[in-house]
UniProtKB/Swiss-Prot annotation:
One of its GO terms (biological process) is methylation. This is Ubiquinone biosynthesis O-methyltransferase. The keyword Methyltransferase applies. Keywords: Methyltransferase, S-adenosyl-L-methionine, Transferase, Ubiquinone biosynthesis. O-methyltransferase that catalyzes the 2 O-methylation steps in the ubiquinone biosynthetic pathway. It holds the Pfam family Methyltransf_23. InterPro entries: SAM-dependent_MTases_sf, UbiG_MeTrfase. It catalyses: a 3-demethylubiquinol + S-adenosyl-L-methionine = a ubiquinol + S-adenosyl-L-homocysteine + H(+); a 3-(all-trans-polyprenyl)benzene-1,2-diol + S-adenosyl-L-methionine = a 2-methoxy-6-(all-trans-polyprenyl)phenol + S-adenosyl-L-homocysteine + H(+).
Length: 232
Protein backbone atom coordinates (compact mmCIF):
# COMPACT_ATOMS: atom_id res chain seq x y z
CA UNK A 1 0.00 0.00 0.00
CA UNK A 2 1.41 3.37 -1.04
CA UNK A 3 2.17 5.87 1.73
CA UNK A 4 0.33 8.66 -0.12
CA UNK A 5 -2.74 10.67 0.93
CA UNK A 6 -4.49 11.60 -2.32
CA UNK A 7 -6.53 14.32 -0.61
CA UNK A 8 -3.31 15.98 0.57
CA UNK A 9 -1.83 15.75 -2.92
CA UNK A 10 -5.00 17.33 -4.37
CA UNK A 11 -4.69 20.37 -2.07
CA UNK A 12 -1.32 21.29 -3.52
CA UNK A 13 -2.21 20.28 -7.08
CA UNK A 14 -4.92 22.94 -7.06
CA UNK A 15 -2.52 25.67 -5.94
CA UNK A 16 0.59 24.60 -7.86
CA UNK A 17 0.45 27.35 -10.49
CA UNK A 18 1.02 29.94 -7.73
CA UNK A 19 4.00 28.15 -6.13
CA UNK A 20 6.59 30.75 -7.19
CA UNK A 21 4.34 33.78 -6.59
CA UNK A 22 5.90 35.31 -3.48
CA UNK A 23 2.63 37.05 -2.58
CA UNK A 24 0.48 33.92 -2.91
CA UNK A 25 -0.46 31.18 -0.45
CA UNK A 26 3.17 30.09 -0.68
CA UNK A 27 4.55 33.36 0.71
CA UNK A 28 5.39 31.69 4.06
CA UNK A 29 7.51 29.07 2.28
CA UNK A 30 9.40 31.79 0.42
CA UNK A 31 9.86 33.82 3.61
CA UNK A 32 11.25 30.96 5.70
CA UNK A 33 13.33 29.39 2.95
CA UNK A 34 16.51 31.48 3.49
CA UNK A 35 16.44 30.74 7.23
CA UNK A 36 16.07 27.03 6.64
CA UNK A 37 18.68 26.79 3.89
CA UNK A 38 21.21 28.71 6.01
CA UNK A 39 20.58 26.43 9.00
CA UNK A 40 21.00 23.31 6.86
CA UNK A 41 24.05 24.66 5.02
CA UNK A 42 25.81 25.61 8.26
CA UNK A 43 25.53 21.98 9.40
CA UNK A 44 25.88 20.06 6.14
CA UNK A 45 28.12 22.30 3.99
CA UNK A 46 26.00 21.78 0.88
CA UNK A 47 28.60 22.74 -1.75
CA UNK A 48 29.63 19.65 -3.69
CA UNK A 49 27.17 17.40 -1.85
CA UNK A 50 24.64 15.06 -3.43
CA UNK A 51 21.30 16.06 -1.91
CA UNK A 52 17.78 14.61 -2.00
CA UNK A 53 14.77 16.85 -1.28
CA UNK A 54 11.81 14.66 -0.27
CA UNK A 55 8.42 16.31 -0.82
CA UNK A 56 10.01 19.05 -2.94
CA UNK A 57 6.76 20.54 -4.23
CA UNK A 58 7.45 23.38 -6.64
CA UNK A 59 11.17 23.37 -5.91
CA UNK A 60 11.70 26.37 -3.62
CA UNK A 61 14.11 24.54 -1.30
CA UNK A 62 15.58 22.37 -4.07
CA UNK A 63 16.66 25.37 -6.13
CA UNK A 64 18.06 27.18 -3.10
CA UNK A 65 20.25 24.19 -2.21
CA UNK A 66 21.40 23.87 -5.82
CA UNK A 67 22.42 27.53 -5.70
CA UNK A 68 24.62 26.64 -2.71
CA UNK A 69 26.54 24.24 -4.94
CA UNK A 70 24.72 20.98 -4.22
CA UNK A 71 23.69 18.42 -6.82
CA UNK A 72 19.99 18.15 -6.01
CA UNK A 73 17.30 15.60 -6.76
CA UNK A 74 13.74 16.59 -5.80
CA UNK A 75 10.94 14.06 -5.43
CA UNK A 76 7.21 14.55 -4.94
CA UNK A 77 4.00 12.71 -5.74
CA UNK A 78 2.20 15.82 -6.97
CA UNK A 79 2.27 16.00 -10.75
CA UNK A 80 1.35 19.69 -10.99
CA UNK A 81 3.93 20.95 -8.45
CA UNK A 82 6.64 18.96 -10.22
CA UNK A 83 5.62 20.48 -13.56
CA UNK A 84 5.88 23.93 -11.99
CA UNK A 85 9.30 23.07 -10.55
CA UNK A 86 10.57 21.87 -13.92
CA UNK A 87 9.25 24.97 -15.68
CA UNK A 88 10.75 27.30 -13.10
CA UNK A 89 14.22 25.81 -13.41
CA UNK A 90 14.09 26.55 -17.12
CA UNK A 91 13.44 30.19 -16.22
CA UNK A 92 15.97 30.36 -13.39
CA UNK A 93 18.70 28.30 -15.01
CA UNK A 94 19.16 26.34 -11.77
CA UNK A 95 19.71 22.64 -12.41
CA UNK A 96 17.66 20.16 -10.33
CA UNK A 97 16.56 16.65 -11.25
CA UNK A 98 12.87 16.15 -10.44
CA UNK A 99 11.10 12.80 -10.18
CA UNK A 100 7.56 11.70 -9.36
CA UNK A 101 8.25 8.86 -6.93
CA UNK A 102 7.70 8.09 -3.25
CA UNK A 103 10.57 8.10 -0.78
CA UNK A 104 9.94 4.42 -0.10
CA UNK A 105 10.21 3.46 -3.77
CA UNK A 106 13.33 5.56 -4.32
CA UNK A 107 14.93 3.95 -1.26
CA UNK A 108 14.59 0.58 -2.98
CA UNK A 109 16.23 2.01 -6.09
CA UNK A 110 18.93 4.25 -4.57
CA UNK A 111 20.05 3.10 -1.10
CA UNK A 112 22.94 5.00 0.50
CA UNK A 113 23.29 7.36 -2.47
CA UNK A 114 22.94 10.82 -0.89
CA UNK A 115 25.18 12.89 1.38
CA UNK A 116 22.21 14.90 2.64
CA UNK A 117 18.45 14.27 2.66
CA UNK A 118 15.91 17.00 3.43
CA UNK A 119 12.25 16.37 4.21
CA UNK A 120 10.62 19.68 5.15
CA UNK A 121 6.91 20.33 5.74
CA UNK A 122 6.06 16.89 4.35
CA UNK A 123 5.72 14.40 7.22
CA UNK A 124 2.43 15.93 8.40
CA UNK A 125 0.89 15.25 4.98
CA UNK A 126 1.44 11.46 4.73
CA UNK A 127 -0.42 8.56 6.40
CA UNK A 128 2.74 7.00 7.91
CA UNK A 129 5.50 9.51 8.70
CA UNK A 130 7.74 6.84 10.23
CA UNK A 131 7.83 5.02 6.89
CA UNK A 132 9.21 8.14 5.19
CA UNK A 133 11.81 8.55 7.94
CA UNK A 134 12.98 4.95 7.48
CA UNK A 135 13.24 5.56 3.73
CA UNK A 136 15.31 8.71 4.30
CA UNK A 137 17.67 6.69 6.52
CA UNK A 138 18.08 4.10 3.78
CA UNK A 139 18.91 6.70 1.14
CA UNK A 140 21.49 8.72 3.06
CA UNK A 141 25.07 7.50 3.07
CA UNK A 142 26.63 6.33 6.36
CA UNK A 143 27.88 9.50 8.03
CA UNK A 144 25.34 11.57 6.10
CA UNK A 145 22.69 13.91 7.49
CA UNK A 146 18.91 13.99 7.27
CA UNK A 147 16.91 17.14 8.07
CA UNK A 148 13.20 17.13 8.92
CA UNK A 149 10.74 19.93 9.64
CA UNK A 150 7.14 19.74 10.76
CA UNK A 151 4.66 21.25 13.23
CA UNK A 152 4.33 20.40 16.92
CA UNK A 153 1.04 19.01 18.24
CA UNK A 154 -0.24 21.02 21.20
CA UNK A 155 -2.85 23.72 21.87
CA UNK A 156 -0.44 26.55 21.00
CA UNK A 157 0.38 24.94 17.64
CA UNK A 158 -3.33 24.57 16.89
CA UNK A 159 -3.91 28.22 17.74
CA UNK A 160 -0.96 29.53 15.70
CA UNK A 161 -0.63 27.08 12.79
CA UNK A 162 -4.31 26.41 12.13
CA UNK A 163 -6.55 29.11 13.63
CA UNK A 164 -4.05 31.96 13.29
CA UNK A 165 -2.31 31.09 10.03
CA UNK A 166 -5.36 29.81 8.14
CA UNK A 167 -8.34 31.70 9.57
CA UNK A 168 -7.12 34.98 11.10
CA UNK A 169 -3.94 36.06 9.31
CA UNK A 170 -4.81 34.20 6.08
CA UNK A 171 -1.18 33.16 5.64
CA UNK A 172 -2.29 29.76 4.34
CA UNK A 173 -5.43 28.41 2.63
CA UNK A 174 -8.02 27.03 5.02
CA UNK A 175 -7.70 23.29 5.36
CA UNK A 176 -3.97 23.23 4.62
CA UNK A 177 -3.21 21.44 7.87
CA UNK A 178 -4.88 18.69 9.89
CA UNK A 179 -4.03 19.15 13.57
CA UNK A 180 -4.24 15.40 14.21
CA UNK A 181 -1.30 14.89 11.83
CA UNK A 182 1.01 17.31 13.63
CA UNK A 183 4.05 15.64 15.20
CA UNK A 184 5.61 16.24 18.61
CA UNK A 185 9.41 16.53 18.73
CA UNK A 186 9.48 13.51 21.04
CA UNK A 187 7.65 11.46 18.41
CA UNK A 188 9.87 12.64 15.57
CA UNK A 189 12.94 11.93 17.67
CA UNK A 190 11.74 8.44 18.55
CA UNK A 191 10.90 7.58 14.93
CA UNK A 192 14.30 8.89 13.84
CA UNK A 193 16.18 6.84 16.43
CA UNK A 194 14.13 3.75 15.59
CA UNK A 195 15.15 4.21 11.94
CA UNK A 196 18.84 4.44 12.87
CA UNK A 197 19.22 8.22 12.85
CA UNK A 198 20.83 10.10 15.73
CA UNK A 199 19.21 13.44 16.59
CA UNK A 200 21.93 16.12 16.69
CA UNK A 201 20.09 19.44 16.88
CA UNK A 202 16.63 21.02 16.98
CA UNK A 203 15.52 24.58 16.26
CA UNK A 204 12.19 26.37 16.28
CA UNK A 205 10.79 28.79 13.73
CA UNK A 206 8.65 31.64 15.05
CA UNK A 207 6.49 34.26 13.34
CA UNK A 208 5.84 37.80 14.54
CA UNK A 209 2.46 38.93 13.13
CA UNK A 210 3.27 42.60 13.84
CA UNK A 211 6.56 42.73 11.93
CA UNK A 212 5.52 39.86 9.62
CA UNK A 213 8.95 38.34 10.04
CA UNK A 214 10.11 34.83 10.81
CA UNK A 215 13.16 33.94 12.86
CA UNK A 216 14.92 30.86 14.18
CA UNK A 217 14.50 30.44 17.93
CA UNK A 218 14.74 27.92 20.75
CA UNK A 219 10.92 27.88 20.92
CA UNK A 220 9.79 24.61 19.27
CA UNK A 221 6.14 24.91 20.33
CA UNK A 222 4.88 25.36 16.75
CA UNK A 223 7.21 25.00 13.74
CA UNK A 224 10.53 23.24 14.21
CA UNK A 225 13.38 21.49 12.36
CA UNK A 226 15.70 18.71 13.43
CA UNK A 227 19.13 17.63 12.24
CA UNK A 228 19.85 13.90 12.33
CA UNK A 229 22.91 11.84 11.50
CA UNK A 230 23.28 8.34 10.14
CA UNK A 231 26.29 6.91 11.91
CA UNK A 232 29.23 5.95 9.71
Amino acid sequence: MSNVDRAEIAKFEALAHRWWDRESEFKPLHDINPLRVNWIDERANLAGKKVLDVGCGGGILSEAMALRGATVTGIDMGEAPLAVAQLHQLESGVSVEYRQITAEDLAEEMPEQFDVVTCLEMLEHVPDPSSVIRACHRMVKPGGQVFFSTINRNPKAYLFAVVGAEYILNLLPRGTHDFKKFIRPSELGAWSRDAGLQVKDIIGLTYNPLTKHYKLASDVDVNYMIQTLREA
